[in-house]
Amino acid sequence: MCMDRAICGNFYYGGKFDYLEVIVSDGKIAGIKKDAGNVPKTNYDGAILPAATDIHVHFRTPGETEKEDFGSGSLSAIYGGTTYVMDMPNNRFPITDYNAFGDKLGSIDSTSFADFSLYSMETGKNAMLLDRRSIGLKVYLGGSTNSTGTEVIEEGDIRKINEMNYPVVFHGESERCLKTHQMEEKNLRDHNLARPIDCEIEAAKYVSGLDIKTKIMAHVSSPDVTGNFLREVTPHHLLLNDEMPLGSFGKVNPPLRDSRTQKRLLDDYISGKFDILSSDHAPHTEDDKREFEFAKSGIIGVETRVPLFLALAQKKIVPLDVLYRTAIENPPSIFGIKKGKIEIGYDADFMVIDFTSMKRINDNRLHSKFPVSPFNGMDAIFPSHVIMRGNVVIDRYEDISDPMGVFIPKPQKE
């Protein structure tokens, strides 16, 4: 058993910063006090928040590790204050049964710097074959990277999903709608027109009608996409638009929208109308992005997600509590994982922030295998220290640990 010790400083607790001494034992929070008494103490200057969770990453292991692997992807995560990631199942060989799930888990082995969970892909009729350790299921209603559209989920699968209490994340673009809008694409505006907001709205209507307990509409790109589900949004849809000179490095699914839609989306996020902020980190090689019409969709973002919004919070553009709720507290809570809160029994995962240390994002300082970021040059505040389960993994802006991330399976019903 590890000896108790205390992490001391100004913690974000109860919606405000307050000096606390948080006792850590065996990687978990064991006490929250003004004075922890006679235990070893580590004091941190700056602001201390619980570390973040990203429920939507594509680290490409196995099958496409020339683009990214769990080592490089998870290292990027912890540099950005994210100690827990959930990896999507659209690998080169999609994770559609328990054998594929086991192979993927085995290929990650001990390479992750962050704690992690894995999704399985629901094809509409394969729920009986899925690994019970899956943190949740992903349904691609419209085709995207390494996936084809699933237009209908069979009733038997819906019953099994609810029986197993799987949260289901939907790629919310209707395949039928996408097919009717296919066109030659030369730029971001064309990509927007080829995958219009109407395709998301059509998918949202279908998802709203599904009798599934926990439904999440992924990467919502327009404030008009609403319904009976939780809503996830990404930094790229909040901060970028199809009028920016990003070329194929701004090509994503769903597409970046026009500036008016983007600004309305950001206003909704600022107003607290979204549940989750995720990166949808989806790296590709430079060859994959070379020619717009044939370029693959996806950008990097796991390292910059939280730092971008810490900078916006410091500028009083985004309320800190909105960032806390959508990037830190809600994501693990929705999946039943005890992270993201300063509460006894929760993992001792923290990030230390110097709000006066604002920097511009520099591709050359990012840790993805292909660090070409559409946010290059934007203001960000990166954590000076990151602590995962009581262990310091980033110290004075540098990683100091070997990979120590652990696999977190879906909590089983008692």
UniProtKB/Swiss-Prot annotation:
The active site is at D280. Its EC number is 3.5.2.3. Zn(2+) 1 binds at H56, H58, K138, D280. The keyword Zinc applies. Disulfide bonds: none annotated. Gene3D superfamilies: Metal-dependent hydrolases, Urease, subunit C, domain 1. GO terms for cellular component: cytoplasm. It comes from the Archaea. Keywords: Hydrolase, Metal-binding, Pyrimidine biosynthesis, Zinc. Its cofactor is Zn(2+). One of its GO terms (molecular function) is allantoinase activity. It catalyses: (S)-dihydroorotate + H2O = N-carbamoyl-L-aspartate + H(+). Pathway: Pyrimidine metabolism; UMP biosynthesis via de novo pathway; (S)-dihydroorotate from bicarbonate: step 3/3. It holds the Pfam family Amidohydro_1. Binds 2 Zn(2+) ions per subunit. GO terms for biological process: 'de novo' UMP biosynthetic process; purine nucleobase catabolic process. The modification N6-carboxylysine is found at K138. The keyword Protease does not apply. Zn(2+) 2 binds at K138, H171, H219. Substrate binds at H58, F59, R60, N90, H284. Transmembrane segments: none annotated. Catalyzes the reversible cyclization of carbamoyl aspartate to dihydroorotate. Belongs to the metallo-dependent hydrolases superfamily. DHOase family. Class I DHOase subfamily. This is Dihydroorotase.
